Curated annotation (Swiss-Prot):
Residues 290-291 are vesicular. Gene3D superfamilies: 1.20.5.110, 1.20.58.70. SUPFAM superfamilies: t-snare proteins. Keywords: Coiled coil, Cytoplasmic vesicle, Lysosome, Membrane, Neurotransmitter transport, Phosphoprotein, Synapse, Transmembrane, Transmembrane helix, Transport. Residues 1-268 are cytoplasmic. Its main location: membrane. Belongs to the syntaxin family. Residues 33-117 form a coiled coil. One of its GO terms (cellular component) is endomembrane system. Residues 1-20 are annotated as: Disordered. Residues 195-257 form the t-SNARE coiled-coil homology domain. This is Syntaxin-1A. CDD domains: SNARE_syntaxin1, SynN.
Length: 291
């Protein structure tokens, strides 16, 4: 009896340990996904910040180009915005690459679960959004470069030194502002201001080209990632759309069924009422007959 009692206690203890282990695993799983979604929100917030900064950069570009003279304060604010974009973009890229590596490790281990699919979908969505924002930033930088070129070209025409696009590009490749001022006589204050503006625009272009080159590798890396994920996202969107169509069809069928059910119910009620009335009439007739 003592041995049997001891064995039962050991068995009960083993069951408790298994239940505890399962509970711990479940809690750990929930905690892992909570941490993942917190990371997703953090990345989304950083992408939104980059997007807001890109819009501010556009405003600064317009302010600089519309000003008759170079505003150093505005230019410094523009440089600060560009530095902030670069910092946040690098952080986003690093976090997305980290998620990508974790997903690849699980796929190599032949792990497949709903959580893995969720993480892949979230990663793809964030990557696409990030590439869209950075594409807009790249477009903004390129557009500003062209506008600066146009302003330099107009200013050179004012100083009596007209240039075409090819000549201007060659001048820009020199990387030296003095290329634009060679042979120009600065007799008036207006001429000096014009040349100063040309040099300022040239410096802007040089900074832009540096910024664009720094972002190029990041942009290509993320663009290739999104392209490789495109087919998967398209499949997800396809199934979601068809699921919505199915839900709408099912809803319509349900409404029809309810409508037919309601009609059938009304028919049953009418038949019961008729039978009741007929029963009352028959009873009245029989009772009057025997009386």
């Amino acid at each position: 009896m003592t041995k049997d009692r001891l064995a039962a206690l050991h068995a009960a203890q083993s069951d408790d340990e298994e239940e505890t282990e399962v509970a711990v695993n479940v809690d750990g799983h929930d905690s892992y996904m909570d941490d993942f979604f917190a990371q997703v929100e953090e990345i989304r917030g950083m992408i939104d910040k980059v997007q807001d900064n890109v819009e501010e950069v556009k405003k600064k570009h317009s302010a600089i180009l519309s000003a008759p003279q170079t505003d150093e304060k505005t230019k410094q604010e523009l440089e600060d915005l560009m530095a902030d974009i670069k910092k946040n973009a690098n952080r986003v890229r690093g976090k997305l690459k980290g998620i990508e590596q974790n997903i690849e490790q699980e796929e190599q281990q032949n792990k497949s679960s709903a959580d893995l699919r969720i993480r892949k979908t979230q990663h793809s969505t964030l990557s696409r959004k990030f590439v869209e924002v950075m594409t807009e930033y790249n477009r903004t930088q390129t557009d500003y470069r062209e506008r600066c070129k146009g302003r330099i070209q107009r200013q050179l025409e004012i100083t009596g030194r007209p240039t075409n696009d090819d000549e201007l590009e060659k001048m820009l490749e020199e990387g030296n502002s003095s290329v634009f001022t060679q042979g120009i006589i600065m007799e008036t204050q207006q001429a000096k201001q014009t040349l100063a503006d040309i040099e300022a625009r040239h410096q802007d272009i040089m900074k832009l080209e540096t910024s664009i080159k720094e972002l190029h590798d990041m942009f290509m890396d993320m663009a290739m990632l999104v392209e490789s994920q495109g087919e998967m996202i398209d499949r997800i969107e396809y199934h979601v759309e068809h699921a919505m169509d199915y839900v709408q069809t099912a809803t319509q069928d349900t409404k029809k069924a309810l409508k037919y059910q309601s009609k059938a119910r009304r028919k049953k009620i009418m038949i019961l009422i008729c039978l009741t009335v007929l029963g009352i009439l028959a009873a009245s007739y029989v009772s009057s007959y025997f009386m």
